[in-house]
Structures are given as C-alpha cells and as structure tokens.
C-alpha cells in the first residue's frame, strides 16, 4: 500500500501504529536509499560469519535477534542467504507491525516474533543481532545500556548489524546532506508538504548521531572491530564484531 500518511499534518508525534504499519514497507523503500541492498548486505555478513564457523564454541542452532523487526523484511533476506538450521527471533513493541511480519513469514518455521520492549528483554546467547534503523529511535540515554546488553549476549566472534540515519558534525555539510536527501525523497514521489509534515512528526522522536558517534558508542561497550560497510550521504550500515 502506498504511503500517503503525511498528505496532511498528523498533529502528533510519529508512532508505529496501525496506520503506519499498513504503509510501512512502501515508506521504507521510498525513504531509505538502497534499503534492500543494505538488508542483503547485512544478511551476507551474518551468513558468512556462520558459514565460516569462526565461533570457538558454535551454538548448536545459531540464534539471531532482529530488534525492532517491524514487518520482518530482514528475516526474508536472511532466509535467502543462510542454508543451515537457524532460529530467528524478531522483537518489536508494535503489534500492528508484527501482524504484518507474521503474515509475510507464515511459511517459515524458523521464525518467531515477540511483542515486547526490547529494552526489557533478557536475551539468550546469540550468534548475531540486528538493529536496522532502530537505534535512532531509542532515547540517547538508553542506547549505551542496550548495546552493552547486546554485547554481553553475543557469542564470541558474533556480529551486530547497525543500520542508521546519521548526521554530519559539520553544520554546512549536514545541511547539504539533508537537502540532498529531501531531493531523493521528492524523486521517490513525496511532495514538499509530505516531507515537511513527516519531519515535524519525527522531531525529537528520531535522533540521529554522527557516524563517528555511533562507532564510538559501539567501541565504548566493548566492540573492538566496527566497520562501515555501506554509506550513502546520511545513511550507513555498520558491522560490529565481538572478539
């Protein structure tokens, strides 16, 4: 379904409710440059990590968490690239999103969804975690706590994927990057009003960090190897490995 949610001002802060869930896939594809390429790239690194079996004590059945899994797109990408027996757990606090995900992945028997606040979940030991365009919605004070919890739950040599919208630390460059991104959205069919109304709804809800800040945050919780494997203007995909 086409995203026309912001044809008029919502007069409220953005939230992942039923109206958003209905158009969310279209919103992602038209709002995140190279969205599917980043999903496939992230799935590749997790698949390679499992295939090369570089864990000192591999888990009997690799467990992968997708936090803020929304409509389950990343699990489709993972199942296309991973041949071995795995367990996929998607966690999201939006039931409308999870209903879409369950419908989309009903034919996969290795997927389980939980409607919970992932900040309150006690994770099992896992081979990989993904936070794809999710950390930017977590309150800044809680980000380090969440990442530390993920780090502690990762198996040795496990990986964390972090996809984020980012900002520049240079004021002029940041303005130019935002302007280019708005041009991108216009080319995807969004009007000036839709762009402005969405920006208004996301104010103080989506809080981006710079690339340097995100890397520093990951390093501060223990990750010694953090790589930006993809970047387009103000979007990036990071792979962090626990060693």
Curated annotation (Swiss-Prot):
This protein's record includes keyword Transferase: yes
Protein name, entry field: Carboxy-S-adenosyl-L-methionine synthase
Enzymatic reactions: prephenate + S-adenosyl-L-methionine = carboxy-S-adenosyl-L-methionine + 3-phenylpyruvate + H2O
EC number(s) stated in the UniProt entry for this protein: 2.1.3.-
Taxonomy of the source species: Bacteria, Pseudomonadati, Campylobacterota, Epsilonproteobacteria, Campylobacterales
Organism (species): Helicobacter pylori (strain P12)
Record keywords, A-Z: S-adenosyl-L-methionine, Transferase
Domain of life: Bacteria
Family that this chain belongs to: Belongs to the class I-like SAM-binding methyltransferase superfamily. Cx-SAM synthase family.
A Pfam family matched in the record: Methyltransf_25
InterPro entries hit by this protein: CmoA, Methyltransf_25, SAM-dependent_MTases_sf
Annotated function: Catalyzes the conversion of S-adenosyl-L-methionine (SAM) to carboxy-S-adenosyl-L-methionine (Cx-SAM).
Subunit structure: Homodimer.
Residues involved in S-adenosyl-L-methionine binding: 35, 68-70, 92-93, 199
GO MF entries: carboxyl- or carbamoyltransferase activity; S-adenosyl-L-methionine binding
GO biological process: tRNA wobble uridine modification
SUPFAM superfamilies: S-adenosyl-L-methionine-dependent methyltransferases
UniProt keyword S-adenosyl-L-methionine, yes or no: yes
């Amino acid at each position: 379904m086409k995203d026309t949610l912001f044809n008029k001002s919502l007069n409220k802060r953005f939230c992942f409710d039923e109206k958003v869930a209905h158009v969310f896939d279209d919103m992602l594809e038209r709002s995140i440059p190279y969205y599917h390429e980043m999903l496939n790239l992230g799935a590749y690194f997790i698949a390679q990590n499992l295939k090369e079996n570089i864990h000192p004590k591999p888990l009997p059945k690799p467990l992968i968490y997708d936090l803020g899994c929304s409509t389950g797109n990343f699990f489709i990408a993972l199942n296309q690239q991973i041949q071995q027996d795995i367990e996929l757990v998607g966690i999201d606090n939006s039931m409308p999103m999870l209903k879409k995900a369950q419908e989309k992945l009903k034919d996969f028997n290795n997927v389980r969804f939980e409607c919970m606040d992932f900040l309150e979940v006690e994770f099992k030991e896992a081979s990989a975690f993904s936070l794809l365009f999710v950390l930017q919605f977590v309150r800044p004070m809680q980000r380090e706590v969440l990442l530390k919890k993920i780090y502690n739950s990762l198996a040795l040599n496990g990986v964390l994927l972090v996809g984020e919208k980012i900002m520049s630390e240079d004021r002029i460059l940041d303005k130019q990057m935002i302007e280019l991104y708005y041009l991108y959205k216009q080319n995807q069919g969004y009007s000036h009003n839709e762009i402005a109304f969405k920006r208004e709804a996301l104010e103080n809800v989506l809080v981006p960090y710079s690339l340097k800040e995100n890397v520093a945050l990951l390093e501060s919780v223990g990750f010694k190897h953090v790589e930006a494997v993809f970047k387009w203007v103000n979007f990036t995909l990071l792979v962090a490995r626990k060693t």
